[in-house]
A protein has these predicted regions:
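Short hydrophobic/aromatic beta-strand or adjacent loop that forms the aromatic wall/cage
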Residues: 50, 137-141
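Extreme N-terminal starter segment of soluble prokaryotic enzymes
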Residues: 1-3
Length: 148
């Protein structure tokens, strides 16, 4: 398994992976995007906002990591639902820490308990919570600092 920069040829697969992984969490609601909406957002953000990476094993993509380096932020980190718990997330998180060695921030939904446990396990600390007006639920702001 390697982490490499994603290319436009990967975008359709990664957009579907993002959607499928989000749906597998089980916290979606009526305000969430359709598969087509996620694809449109993915293509736009990949072109305008993200440094995008993928976890690849042979010819299969298993995860995505979307960084916003100017904000030292992980915007998205998702693993194929079949690959959860296999170390792919750890591989992507370690890569993010190498890309942003001075510290990282990220946001997740409060009820995304598996992600919150993952971030805590990888040295992130909860800084604050606030209401997310789009999804109408609480979101958590996390930060990682070197040495933590």
């Amino acid at each position: 398994m390697i982490v490499r920069p994603a290319t436009p040829a990967d975008y359709a697969v990664l957009a579907d992976l993002w959607f499928d992984s989000w749906m597998s969490i089980g916290i979606s609601n009526d305000t969430d995007l359709s598969r087509e909406g996620v694809r449109a957002r993915f293509y736009n953000d990949a072109a305008t906002k993200w440094d995008l990476f993928t976890a690849e094993d042979g010819d299969r993509l298993h995860g995505l990591l979307a960084l916003v380096p100017t904000e030292a932020r992980i915007d998205q980190i998702f693993v194929d639902p079949e690959g959860k718990g296999t170390g792919i997330g750890r591989l992507l998180m370690d890569y993010a820490k190498r890309c942003l060695p001075d510290g990282i921030v990220l946001v997740t939904h409060t009820d995304n308990l598996r992600a919150r446990a993952f971030y805590t396990h990888h040295g992130f600390t909860l800084e604050r919570t606030e209401e997310d007006p789009v999804h109408r639920r609480q979101k958590c702001h996390y930060a990682w600092r070197p040495g933590s």
